[in-house]
A protein has these predicted regions:
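Sec-dependent N-terminal signal peptides
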Residues: 4-13
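Intrinsic-disorder/low-complexity linker and hinge segments
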Residues: 15-17
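Catalytic glycan-binding domains that act on GlcNAc-containing polysaccharides
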Residues: 19-129
Length: 129
């Protein structure tokens, strides 16, 4: 019985976190590309406006974890793979799943500053309402 309770509690925790990422991802996609998976702005492309450096960082994280999976620059145009990269990036740099940190990380990278990401953070929070 104890094992069942632990499994159910763990499932609820994962489910709640996934629901939070869904809201965050939808808001970021709205701010970044107005929901357009073909959007291009300089070297940022796709639904979440992913830069080549993020793809490289995701592949480094995967390699560090012992995974053979790798993302390509073309994967930035794929909404499913873009979301996977977002979740992977967050799991590495934001393991507690803090929503504010997730938004700021996406805008400013792993060395973000609060001041430098404030306008973006405010836009995404407004889009979440």
């Amino acid at each position: 019985m104890k094992r069942i309770i632990i499994i159910v509690a763990f499932s609820i925790s994962i489910s709640a976190q996934a629901r939070d990422w869904g809201r965050v991802l939808k808001a970021i996609a709205t701010v970044e590309s107005n929901g357009n998976p073909r959007a291009v702005c300089g070297d940022q492309v796709g639904l979440l406006q992913i830069r080549p450096i993020l793809v490289k960082d995701c592949n480094r994280i995967l390699e560090k974890r012992g995974s053979n999976k790798r993302y390509t620059l073309r994967d930035r145009y794929n909404p499913v793979k873009s979301r996977e990269m977002f979740v992977l990036y967050q799991s590495h740099y934001n393991p507690k799943g803090n929503i504010e940190r997730a938004i700021r990380l996406w805008n400013g990278g792993s060395g973000y500053s609060v001041r430098g990401t404030q306008k973006y953070y405010n836009k995404v929070r407004r889009a979440m309402k």
